């Protein structure tokens, strides 16, 4: 599921990834949510508490489906935008590719 934020991970800098693109599965309706962050644990906690986004707030609970390490925030925003343009089937294939 979630890659280790260790140095050497794809997109990792000396202290680990500078940013993450993540996909959440909303268990209420099995929808997928894509976002980016520089602090994955904090962002997941926000989503799970209902403070993350309007979209996930109404579809709790959520689970992390995939997390992709990114070298910087700009790369994370671009990858988020690219993933948001994918079809559901393409997003599910991307999730299935993750370790």
Each language-model region and where it sits:
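GIY-YIG nuclease catalytic motif and its immediate N-terminal context
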Residues: 1-84, 88-99
